[in-house]
Amino acid sequence: AMDRPLAKITKLKVVINTAKDDYVNCEEIEFYEMKSGLSEQEKQLLSVFTDLTCSEVRPEATMQQIQALPGYFINIAMQLKNGTYDTWEKKFRIQEYKPYSTPNNWADKLYMKSYTDLDNPTGIYVNSGDELIVMVGETYGNTISLQAIRSSNLSGDKYMLNEGINKLQMKGDGMLFVMYNTELTSENAKPVKIHIPLTSGTVSGYFDLERDKTDAVYTELLQKATYEYFLIKGNEMLLNFHRTKLLQWQPNSIVEYITMFDHFVNWQYELLGLEDIRPALFNNHVNGSSINDDSYMWAGNGQIGFGINALDEFMPTEKLYTERRCWGPAHEIGHLHQGAIAWTGCFESSNNLFSNYVLYKIGRECSNGAPLSVLADRKLNNRPFCNFLGDPKKEDTEIHMRIYWQLWLYFHRCGIKSDFYPELFKKLRNNRNLNNIPVG
């Protein structure tokens, strides 16, 4: 943000000093004029509604005042006043949206891949060409926008929102997400109330563990949903899965399932040493989405992907315990967190420090990786556990993961230094010169 606004600008020069992989691609730049003051229509609405979200009618508002509103708002006012606004629709159309951190900023600071910025689902989807009215309450000076995300995409068409009445024309289809990213320590990082009224988009819903709490609520929401994907919002994870797969494997229960995924993330935090950072400063979610192709599992910035048929490996919930199927998801989550130890040749093994820890936490006595006899044989024959200058594809991931895990067993399990890994990760984050081995 600028210290003072600039007036009468005729030219804008964009200077980019750094870029990932020395590559820059500017797809689009948009400019917006910030609204100042209330319009006459908004002043009229405030004579009937308690605020510009038009989500509650003033007790003193008269029928004469209501009838004087534009027809669209008469219907909203009457449904609110008479208590006939459909409860299910209202649950998603009128919501308070929390502030979230900016994931890209924290990815760099924490030596991690970026988490998602799709932390605020609306449960409402739109089609290309739809006209929307979006009514926004006080934003406390924050930048708020709406984004339409198609299926499992990471980004989509974005629409800036001002306080008050916003009239939008949809350029594409997708599920709507509120984009509200700011510094969490700011005194202005407060929830923002938004109303997307009746006939603006279609409600399909989503499950929020903090709000909805029970399997009974989940079952009802899933049955009513109509969109291709159904989103489950946990405390640490977002699961954006094909609705048909949820109906197949988890038709009546989700609380234990999403709680397990939350555990997978939280357990990995125990190794990373983020207690002073999360969630006070950094509160974005890990996004796990099913992908409509024949891929298996992978991890990248903003998302962990599961091929649609790969879901069969770790659903229903029982598989996460009984068949050690938690390894795949935990391995991919580990890819997000391995940056500080992902040395060349170890990209597919250093993350298994985290997945082995997940196995330990769910009560498995045996870790994955080559047995100690193989490690001892390497030492006997003077062979290193990893050749950092060699071809990563020819390296032995089974040996690599054993080395990382043996350090945990020695320092943590044997009680030699129970904070070894958290302290190591903190030092690697705080002094990048300690970690000068190429990543790959």
Where are these regions (language model features)?
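Catalytic cores of extracellular degradative/oxidative enzymes
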Residues: 218-221, 228-435
